[in-house]
Amino acid sequence: MQLLLSSVCMALTSAVIGFAYYQKQQFYPAVVYITKSNASMGVIYIQFFVIVFMFGKLLSKIFLGTLRAAEFEHLLERFWYALTETCLAFTVFRDDFNPRFVALFTVLLFLKSFHWLAEERVDFMERSPVLGWLFHIRVGSLLTVLGILDYVLLIHAYNSTLVRGPTVQLVFGFEYAILLTVIASTAIKYVLHAAEMRTDTPWENKAVFLLYTELVIGLIKVVLYILFVVIMAKIYALPMFVFRPMFFTIRNFRKALNDVIMSRRAIRNMNTLYPDATPEELRQSDNICIICREDMVNHSKKLPCGHIFHTTCLRSWFQRQQTCPTCRLNILRTPTVNSTAMPRQGDEAVAAAAGNPIPAAAGVQPAGGVPPPAPTAVVDGNQARADVNVAGGQALPPNFADLFGDASGLPNGLPNLAGLQIPPPPVMPMISPFMIPPHFGYLTPLPPPPIPQDLTNFTDEELRAMEGLQRDHIVQRLKLLQNINLMLDSAGIMMSQYQSLSARLQLTAVTPATAVNGSADSSVYDMPSTSATAMAQLETHQVTPTAAASSASPTMPAEKVTIEDLGADADEDDIPSTATEAVSIPNSDADFEENSSELGELRKRRLKFLEERNKSAATNERTTAE
């Protein structure tokens, strides 16, 4: 594609030059003809850009070799922004717009492109494990050539401004000054990376030098941009084309300054606040530093989160980030919870030997059994932190055994909750009983600690000793409240299940009547009681023998169903008679829908009768037993 475009441009240029020479027959008149023709100048400009592009490809092959995909992508992104800024610069210097002006801006964009490629290649140098001598020759030669060109063009613009006054060379001088700072920063990075590659161990101070280099270069760029904007605003107009690069320069300088301040603070905290890792801690944890992937023998630091790293690796890491490399904990915050990387033997004994700051009163069990916060265990170098937010009422579910073991040390085994004002814990939403299995043995928690029978006999000192004022006591109260809430929720769910089960058993406790027409003794009570179809079958099959006999004859009208047919023989006075009420036995779904109200009333009366009979039978049994 590139070869085709180059061939087309070359053919058009040859045609334009040949046509001009054919018209004028002399060199000078032909040149004048081409310069006066806009179409001819357009073709010449295109050919000039093609030549510059091909020359750039040649220099890229010489100094850089094959470009990587990331380098080419970043080059295109920056080039389009630079081209837009160049078009804005044309509007400021529209009076000076001529072929020489276009050529100068083309050369500027050409040099900017190679500055960007050199910067990308030096950054890649830090990530590449093996670099040959050809790489160093290419990068060193490119940096040298670019530095010389920037300096020469800067001096030329400076001299031109002194001789001719403020012209367009002022803009080019400023641009080449910025490019000179860029090439200086790139050269310093290259020297630092090359020096580190010559050593077997990582260079500890390289990150510090890089950080301060970015800070100084950023400061110089900010000063240059501010001076250029002030000068251009006084002489020409406000230079809109430098606002975008000036904004990014100020932002990068601010970031570099913030990195310097934060890194110094982090390193100071590391040297003063964080203890050195002991050999025992190194043995109990994974003694491989995840930054350099080497074993940690000595000179290691333990962060507040419990992770251990080399001191030199942490110093280099803190130059860029002020967080733990493993868990991303912000190490600049003041540590509030003392954590350990792995639980050690003897911690429980030390915690049990800790005394209670509140003196025990006479006749009261000492409250020294209240343990301090247990050390947080971290598995595989990761910290499992459980922060109790008293203000928000949020806490992790506690262990019942640990809770009641801690509370046993207080008088009567229960801390007093009086005077503690905390928001209620979040209420667990009630779950439908049909969505939970019928077995709930695993939901039943341990019983709460025993409650003192009479609190009025306790003195003020005893009550204060029971209540407690330390963080441990508050945490235990919150845990106890959460356990109570869990037990209440479990009780509510169990009661819902019991109610639904008892209602179902009342429906299935009735013995089915004799089958109609000698049918098999299949029971309809095994079906769910909530099904409308099952209810219809239940009412159809629960008719008395009299009703069954009447239903056997299809030509006979519907018989009357009385309470005697349901089995009433002793308590007729308690049940209102239904001898005068005629109820049709449904033979289809339509008949059942028409007589649903009568069947429902009949069913209610029958259930009431069964309840009364069961009560009387139970009373007779108790009387007989007495």
Curated annotation (Swiss-Prot):
Domain notes: The RING-type zinc finger is required for E3 ligase activity.
GO MF entry, a single one: p53 binding
GO biological process terms on file: endoplasmic reticulum unfolded protein response; ERAD pathway; intestinal stem cell homeostasis; positive regulation of ubiquitin-dependent protein catabolic process; proteasome-mediated ubiquitin-dependent protein catabolic process; protein ubiquitination; regulation of translation in response to endoplasmic reticulum stress; response to endoplasmic reticulum stress
Pathway as given in its UniProt record: Protein modification; protein ubiquitination
Keyword field contains Transferase: yes
Lumenal face of the membrane: 16-38, 118-128, 189-222
Protein keywords: Endoplasmic reticulum, Membrane, Metal-binding, Signal, Transferase, Transmembrane, Transmembrane helix, Ubl conjugation pathway, Zinc, Zinc-finger
Stretches the record annotates as Interaction with p53/TP53: 234-268
Entry's transmembrane regions: 39-59, 97-117, 129-149, 168-188, 223-243
Biased composition, class Polar residues, residue ranges: 577-587
Gene expressing this chain: sip3
Subunit annotation: Homodimer. Interacts with p53. May interact with Septin2.
Zn finger spans (RING-type): 289-328
Enzyme kind, highest EC tier: transferase
GO CC term, one of those recorded: endoplasmic reticulum
Organism for this UniProt entry: Drosophila melanogaster (Fruit fly)
Family: Belongs to the HRD1 family.
Signal peptide range in chain numbering: 1-15
Region (Disordered): 569-600
Main location: endoplasmic reticulum
Cited Pfam families: zf-RING_2 (PF13639)
Enzyme nomenclature, EC number: 2.3.2.27
Ranges in the topological domain labelled Cytoplasmic: 60-96, 150-167, 244-626
Described function: Acts as an E3 ubiquitin-protein ligase which accepts ubiquitin specifically from endoplasmic reticulum-associated UBC7 E2 ligase and transfers it to substrates, promoting their degradation. Component of the endoplasmic reticulum quality control (ERQC) system also called ER-associated degradation (ERAD) involved in ubiquitin-dependent degradation of misfolded endoplasmic reticulum proteins. Also promotes the degradation of normal but naturally short-lived proteins. Protects cells from ER stress-induced apoptosis.
Topological relation to the membrane, as annotated: Multi-pass membrane protein
Protein name (Swiss-Prot/TrEMBL): E3 ubiquitin-protein ligase HRD1
